[in-house]
């Protein structure tokens, strides 16, 4: 692992909530938790990503494993994986025994759905790799995902939108701009020293 990845993971790992934004504008922003937890026994840089609605915290609507790798100096690639059987690991963020059961063979690499991350003066900026090839099925229709995030200190902003492959019109995703999350728990202490 490089110093750049170690610094990024130390900044990323934790639990985030957009409670303030959701309470101020409930019609446009659901109250969501984002959680990034190291999976120590998998390849270095492997992070469990969980997204849940506050009204249903025990049933993540998105469960992924991302793996950080520095491609060239200062550019981090986040390899994006989904689970073959996500229900088996829905409690893995807070249940260490469940988390320790995750194996490489439980994961499916999501083609063309990886992120490139750069560290700039105002924090880390991540964007889905270019090419409009990360396909997401939503409401019976194929769309391509456009996704970005900005991590600075304890603040994380994200924007995910799905677009029609033919017309490039927005089909789903935020109409009111970015989701703004605040860190409520820091989990950097769970990162193995060998990763840093």
UniProtKB/Swiss-Prot annotation:
The keyword Lyase applies. Keywords: Lyase. The keyword Transcription does not apply. Pfam families: CpeT (PF06206). It is an enzyme of class 4 (lyase). Its EC number is 4.-.-.-. Belongs to the CpcT/CpeT biliprotein lyase family. This is Chromophore lyase CpcT/CpeT. The gene is cpcT.
């Amino acid at each position: 692992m490089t110093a750049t990845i170690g610094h990024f993971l130390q900044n990323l790992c934790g639990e985030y909530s957009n409670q303030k934004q959701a309470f101020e504008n409930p019609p446009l922003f659901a109250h969501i938790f984002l959680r990034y937890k190291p999976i120590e026994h998998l390849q270095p840089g492997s992070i469990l990503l969980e997204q849940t609605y506050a009204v249903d915290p025990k049933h993540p609507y998105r469960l992924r494993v991302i793996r950080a790798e520095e491609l060239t100096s200062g550019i981090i690639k986040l390899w994006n994986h989904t689970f073959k059987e996500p229900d088996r690991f829905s409690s893995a963020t807070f249940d260490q025994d469940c988390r320790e059961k995750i194996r490489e063979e439980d994961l499916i690499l999501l083609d063309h759905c990886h992120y490139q991350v750069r560290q700039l003066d105002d924090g880390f900026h991540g964007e889905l790799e270019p090419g409009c090839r990360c396909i997401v099925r939503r409401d019976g229709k194929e769309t391509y995902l456009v996704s970005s995030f900005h991590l600075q200190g304890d603040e994380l902003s994200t924007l995910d939108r799905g677009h029609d492959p033919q017309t490039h019109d927005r089909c789903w995703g935020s109409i009111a701009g970015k989701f703004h999350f605040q860190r409520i728990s820091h989990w950097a202490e769970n990162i193995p020293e060998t990763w840093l």
